[in-house]
């Protein structure tokens, strides 16, 4: 099924003329415990979509060093491990780098923590920013749908402001 789907998807992408805007990813922050499963999945993704940009949010340099991902996207608190070592540095932030004065967009954070992102992007010559929480109006694991005007923390699982930007 996956090969048939990939073929049809690539045809659609080409018909729409958006090939240069499309990226694919294998997994979100694979852990070192999942290394061998990730390696198998990444190989399949490379076979199916290798002509596209393949990116993955991951913070273990080992995955990139061993050729499992072309474009790693480390969490902002791990950016120094990747700076100067990857061809095109991207980064992201999400619910867990809320300590150590790292930037993020949580509702309860001082505004400076939002604005320092520009300095970090400049300092490390970051070329892309992966934004996951655009419109995730669900509880963790998508078990329930939420009203973003009444509940801002994904059912108490994420810091308020992490799971969506659009209201």
Q: How should each PLM-predicted stretch be described?
A:
Residues 1-143:
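Catalytic-core regions of glycoside hydrolase
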Residues 136-167:
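Predominantly late transmembrane helices and immediately cytosolic-facing juxtamembrane segments
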């Amino acid at each position: 099924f996956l090969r048939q789907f990939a073929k049809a998807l690539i045809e659609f992408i080409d018909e729409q003329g958006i090939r240069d805007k499309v990226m694919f990813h294998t997994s979100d922050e694979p852990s070192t415990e999942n290394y061998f499963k990730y390696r198998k999945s990444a190989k399949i993704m490379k076979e199916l979509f290798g002509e596209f940009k393949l990116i993955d949010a991951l913070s273990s340099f080992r995955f990139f060093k061993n050729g499992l991902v072309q474009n790693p996207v480390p969490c902002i608190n791990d950016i120094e491990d990747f700076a100067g070592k990857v061809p095109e540095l991207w980064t992201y932030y999400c619910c867990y780098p809320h300590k150590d004065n790292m930037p993020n967009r949580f509702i309860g954070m001082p505004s400076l923590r939002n604005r320092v992102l520009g300095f970090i992007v400049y300092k490390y010559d970051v070329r892309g920013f992966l934004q996951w929480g655009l419109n995730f109006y669900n509880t963790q694991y998508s078990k329930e749908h939420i009203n973003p005007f009444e509940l801002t923390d994904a059912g108490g699982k994420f810091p308020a402001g992490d799971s969506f930007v659009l209201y």
